[in-house]
């Protein structure tokens, strides 16, 4: 049997911008993408801690070191600058792989610095 499992999580990132007039997606600082093992164009689920919105989009690489978390296009209607979000990716594993699987967890501080890796 195949199971959908958490692959990576950026926990409590702060939205730095929301740009309605841009092709839909989320722009994420390349350093954060690397820390969470997220690739450009990878599907992500965004959870907005401020309003409860949960939606899917894809990733655009942001400038390394910029700390950018910018929701673009229609997704920008679901967040505001300063909102705290969780960014999730998933993978599909066989049952026997699930027990040893460890997701990549990136815990953020209030300034989009990596506080801890888990």
Curated annotation (Swiss-Prot):
Subcellular location: Cytoplasm
GO function term, MF aspect, one: aspartate 1-decarboxylase activity
Keyword Glycoprotein: no
Residues annotated to bind substrate: 57, 73-75
Active site: 25 (schiff-base intermediate with substrate), 58 (proton donor)
Pathway assigned in UniProt: Cofactor biosynthesis; (R)-pantothenate biosynthesis; beta-alanine from L-aspartate: step 1/1
One of the protein's GO biological processes: alanine biosynthetic process
Modification Pyruvic acid (Ser) occurs at: 25
One GO cellular component, as annotated: cytosol
InterPro entries, A to Z: Asp_de-COase-like_dom_sf, Asp_decarbox
Principal cellular location given in the protein's record: cytoplasm
Enzyme class, first EC level, given as a word: lyase
Reactions catalysed according to its record: L-aspartate + H(+) = beta-alanine + CO2
Cofactor(s), by name: pyruvate
Cofactor binding note: Binds 1 pyruvoyl group covalently per subunit.
Keywords: Autocatalytic cleavage, Cytoplasm, Decarboxylase, Lyase, Pantothenate biosynthesis, Pyruvate, Schiff base, Zymogen
Entry comment on modification after translation: Is synthesized initially as an inactive proenzyme, which is activated by self-cleavage at a specific serine bond to produce a beta-subunit with a hydroxyl group at its C-terminus and an alpha-subunit with a pyruvoyl group at its N-terminus.
E.C. number: 4.1.1.11
Subunit field text: Heterooctamer of four alpha and four beta subunits.
Function summary: Catalyzes the pyruvoyl-dependent decarboxylation of aspartate to produce beta-alanine.
Entry's family note: Belongs to the PanD family.
Protein name, UniProt field: Aspartate 1-decarboxylase
Organism: Syntrophomonas wolfei subsp. wolfei (strain DSM 2245B / Goettingen)
High-level lineage: Bacteria, Bacillati, Bacillota, Clostridia, Eubacteriales
